């Protein structure tokens, strides 16, 4: 498995360099109204510059669900998988803001071992806020976000397929 991982990393090394300052947020279909999506976008834009937004077609949804780490696409409260619906591609801030959640450095390292930039933890603040303003019988996960440049490349490849490298070259 390690050899396969290293082979894939080498194959996308140029794209990883191009993705150093990018983060991708993927809204899920449990962020199910225009109002909730607007809240998520606004909160994302407090820490990131949104550079593109892509409504995911069936093929991209399937690739995102099967080819990316995380996302929690299977939820116990519903029989069918949660679908990724919108990708929000962002440029990271030049300087990371204060840690958006209360967590010790040790717990942060244990819970998010691949995390490169702490601003991405805004996803937890966004989830909490949406669950507060639009409560259900269960908590919504609402969105997924990439933790590092390699995950960003993997997610962009799932979204754009063979055109991911061309997107990164822009």
Task: For each feature predicted by the language model, list its residue ranges.
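Non-catalytic terminal and connector segments of soluble metabolic enzymes
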Residues: 1-170
